[in-house]
Design a protein with these regions (language model features):
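Bacterial Sec-dependent N-terminal signal peptides
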Residues: 1-24
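Catalytic cores of secreted/periplasmic lytic hydrolases that degrade extracellular macromolecules
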Residues: 18-138
Length: 138
């Protein structure tokens, strides 16, 4: 009987801890959306990229702005350096060790570069979709 109670309480504590983590992460995501929704909407009007897609990718790539890359380099989309990139650089392990990522002065600059990045020919088919077709964009 005592061991069953111990198992039950352990399980209950685990569930409460998990619930708190999910709630905390949800709060972080809501804060991220509140902070950057106007930026994403502006980019949508300028570049025809759905704001929901921009926000979703920023949330996933940056952990709602909490990742080391977002905090140290204002890079919310995991955009890496290219051969022609002349700006500041931030290095961290990713797919490979010590990869080079772009550094931005502000998060908003990162959002703009994300829009410009999606204008590359590789993503041209996305722009054939309606801006309201978020499933197609995803």
């Amino acid at each position: 009987m005592r061991s069953r109670l111990l198992v039950f309480f352990s399980f209950a504590l685990s569930c409460m801890s998990l619930s708190a983590q999910v709630s905390y992460r949800s709060a972080e995501t809501i804060e991220y959306i509140e902070r950057f929704h106007k930026t994403a909407i502006r980019e949508m009007y300028l570049y025809n990229i759905p704001a929901s897609i921009t926000l979703a990718q920023g949330i996933l790539e940056s952990g709602s702005g909490r990742s080391p890359l977002a905090r140290s380099a204002n890079n919310h989309f995991g955009i890496k350096c290219t051969d022609d990139y002349k700006g500041k650089r931030y290095h961290q392990d990713d797919d490979r060790r010590h990869e080079c990522f772009r550094v931005y002065s502000t998060p908003e600059e990162s959002f703009r570069d994300h829009s410009l990045f999606l204008l590359r020919p590789h993503y041209a088919d996305l722009f054939k979709l309606r801006i309201t077709d978020y499933k197609g964009w995803a």
